Amino acid sequence: MVVTNQAGVARGYYGEEDVKNLHVYMNHILECMGASIDAFYYCPHHPEHGIGPYKKECSCRKPGTGMFEEAAQRFEVDKAHSFMIGDKLLDVEAGNNYGLTTILVGTGYGSGIRSQEEKEGIPPVYDFYAEDLVKAAQWIIEKGQADVR
């Protein structure tokens, strides 16, 4: 599943249909490679910079857990064996708030966050750091195999 804040909708940069079309396109690309994403959840709101009905406080916007809760109503989510992977501390905070194992990836903003933490001696608030999604997936698979033993 994908959970994503889409403040661009709230700010009027693009519409909800654009977000949905991107998700369809992403799944099409993945399906061509034998994979798929079961569901996409997005928050179109922003508490300060939203326009019209999109300017509001909500439980769906990460670090809130509304999108996770919505997914849990549709799917059987086993928190003990589920992961939140993201490139921002907001993603990690959302996963922590919902009780998931969290992974910060170095793509996007993640490597800068990691560098700053190391430079300033800040302890990580995530469970694992991975350079990219492939390394995150490998760690998840290894962790799963260790849990089975």
Where are these regions (language model features)?
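Structural recognition of the conserved hydrophobic beta-strand(s) that form the central parallel beta-sheet
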Residues: 1-3
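A short secondary-structure junction motif
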Residues: 6-19
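Asp-based, Mg2+/Mn2+-dependent phosphohydrolase catalytic module
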Residues: 16-39, 47-84, 88-149
